[in-house]
Amino acid sequence: MSLKERKSINECDLKGKKVLIRVDFNVPLDDGNITNDYRIRSALPAVQKVLTEGGSCVLMSHLGRPKGVSMAEGKELGSAGGIPGFEQKATLKPVAKALSELLSRPVTFAPDCLNAADVVSKMSPGDVVLLENVRFYKEEGSKKSTEEREAMAKILSSYGDVYISDAFGTAHRDSATMTGIPKILGNGAAGYLMEKEISYFAKVLGNPPRPLVAIVGGAKVSDKIQLLDNMLQRIDYLLIGGAMAYTFLKAQGYSIGISMCEESKLEFARSLLKKAEDRKVQIILPIDHVCHTEFKAVDSPLITEDQNIPEGHMALDIGPKTIEKYVQTIGKCKSAIWNGPMGVFEMVPYSKGTFAIAKAMGRGTHEHGLMSIIGGGDSASAAELSGEAKRMSHVSTGGGASLELLEGKTLPGVTVLDDKE
């Protein structure tokens, strides 16, 4: 898809307005305590912009995957004094407290997102209200009919005048809060986080500084078929790691021991290698591996001499020669996009490949102006763990959304926003 720039929060008249902001506060919780507040902090610039301009904020988010209830069931529960769809592990109440501390001002928590008209009507400029988890209602979901989503969006739309989307992580969802509200209000703009995501993906998918390398890893070829197919039209180099590399190696006739392999995808691997050759895209596969006989961490795993993996062994990371080759390739490029780890990085003996990629991208960005983009999910976690995330050009907050963009799909939560004026 070609990503067009969208109307920015900077172009909106916010003074005296009640501004509905769809944020992504889907933070990790441990017994009600937030273990990583990165997503909350990422939303602060948009919230502060509204408050500085003399508006008030009504914030909407999901957290986790609660079961949820229908609006009809919610009405009954609400009239009986209950909180519709409530699940302790998915409540946004701890987020309201954390947000209040970060903003240094009170944040009012509305315990039922569809029964908050009273709370919202009492708001003055400078006030912030956080609605309870929108997924406590099933109508938020993209699997519901348009009419059902619309019914929920109508109620939420009545709380505000202006709609801002700052939740790139759910931009691939056609849901009540992502697409329903802007359609009803007739306006929709991107917050700063959404704007940054669109800007970087537009660059890498449009006209990036060249050469451009894609580093693709993860377990299954089947999860990345569309991504590989789409990116092959845009890149100069493709580095493949993770368990998916062994399907490609087997397709080339190498022995892969007991490493993971998708037999049904061998033909696809061969055709992709041929397509790359025709398009003069250089696909680089691992030339050595870090192996063991079982899927567990050991002090001295076997490092192979070449591409072949011995019988009875499984590869769990790329080897030192491969690391050197991949790092050299990244060093030759002016743009890099990374999606998926090189090995089982959660286990220390098999983390070197993934962390070496993170380091090469961080150093390239910091020292040579490389445009580096991390496509969310496991790659973002690995970049954080390696300490290199802060040196990258952009670490995406949306695993699923960034994957769909790289596959060439359009994102409903982006296309619904107004075009830049």
Curated annotation (Swiss-Prot):
Assembly, per entry: Monomer.
EC primary class: transferase
Family: Belongs to the phosphoglycerate kinase family.
UniProt GO molecular function: ADP binding; ATP binding; metal ion binding; phosphoglycerate kinase activity
List of residues binding Mg(2+): 219, 223, 378
Positions of AMP binding: 219-220, 224, 243, 315, 346
Residues binding CDP: 218, 223, 242, 340, 345
Primary location: cytoplasm
Transferase among keywords: yes
Compartments (UniProt record): Cytoplasm
Entry binding sites for (2R)-3-phosphoglycerate: 23-26, 39, 61-62, 64-65, 135, 172-173, 220
Reactions this protein catalyses: (2R)-3-phosphoglycerate + ATP = (2R)-3-phospho-glyceroyl phosphate + ADP
Keyword tags: ATP-binding, Cytoplasm, Glycolysis, Kinase, Magnesium, Metal-binding, Nucleotide-binding, Transferase
Further remark: In T.brucei, three genes code for phosphoglycerate kinase isozymes, which are transported to different cell compartments.
Residues at which ATP binds: 219, 224, 243, 315, 346, 378-379
EC nos: 2.7.2.3
Residues engaged in binding ADP: 218-219, 224, 242, 315, 339, 345-346, 378-379
Names of the cofactor(s): Mg(2+)
The name this protein goes by in its record: Phosphoglycerate kinase, cytosolic
Presence of keyword Ribosomal protein: no
